[in-house]
């Protein structure tokens, strides 16, 4: 049995597949990180890790595009800082990820890279809906029909669409080699 995106295996919807009888199991993933901290469950379900390749090595071999990562710090307004300070600890990641100030920074970055192929990637659907509307660009999320996703990705690849807003659905088996800028606005562990 070959499990692609094996880090998903501990989820109830996939976990039952670990009960399928097999002499050999192979799990593949780009990153063995889970928001719920259940990474160790993967090994108990399919066995120990046998092979690990650092991403820089894969990059140097040409299997993935080289990336230059830049952190853009966003200064919250006084009101936003106060709301953050009084928020419940479990709500702070989401709050910082979805502030108006951050949205304005994303708008400025997209404007600055208007000639590039830009992906705006995020975790929170309401934030992505707002960004799609404000930027005037399409959004691909879980409820986007497969045919529509394929059409939008094809238009992005050809340059007909210069910017796409995408949810986590774009994390899985999507090859967008023409993307030159990725803006991560929110994620499972904050932003």
Q: Where on the chain are the PLM-derived regions?
A:
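Conserved Walker B
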Residues: 1, 5-7, 169-170, 186-188
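Post-DEXD/H (motif II) to motif III coupling segment of the RecA-like Helicase ATP-binding lobe
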Residues: 5-71
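Conserved SF2 helicase motif VI
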Residues: 31-32, 181, 188-191
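Switch/connector loops and helix/strand junctions flanking conserved nucleotide-binding motifs
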Residues: 34-38, 173-176, 190-191
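Conserved interdomain hinge at the start of the Helicase C-terminal
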Residues: 79-133
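Conserved helicase ATPase core of P-loop NTP-dependent helicases/translocases
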Residues: 117-121, 126-174
């Amino acid at each position: 049995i070959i499990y692609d995106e094996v880090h998903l295996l501990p989820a109830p919807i996939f976990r039952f597949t670990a009960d399928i009888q097999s002499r050999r199991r192979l799990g593949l993933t780009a990153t063995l990180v889970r928001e719920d901290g259940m990474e160790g469950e993967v090994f108990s379900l399919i066995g120990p890790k046998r092979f690990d390749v650092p991403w820089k090595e894969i990059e140097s071999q040409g299997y993935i595009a080289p990336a230059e990562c830049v952190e853009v710090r966003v200064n919250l307004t006084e009101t936003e800082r106060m709301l953050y300070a009084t928020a419940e600890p479990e709500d702070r990641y989401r709050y910082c990820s979805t502030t108006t100030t951050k949205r304005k920074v994303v708008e400025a970055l997209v404007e600055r890279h208007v000639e590039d192929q830009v992906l705006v990637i995020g975790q929170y659907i309401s934030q992505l809906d707002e960004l799609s509307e404000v930027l005037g660009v399409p959004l691909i999320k879980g409820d986007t029909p497969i045919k529509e996703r394929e059409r939008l990705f094809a238009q992005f690849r050809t340059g007909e669409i210069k910017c796409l807003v995408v949810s986590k659905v774009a994390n899985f088996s999507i090859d967008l080699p023409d993307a030159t800028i990725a803006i991560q606005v929110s994620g499972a562990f904050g932003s």
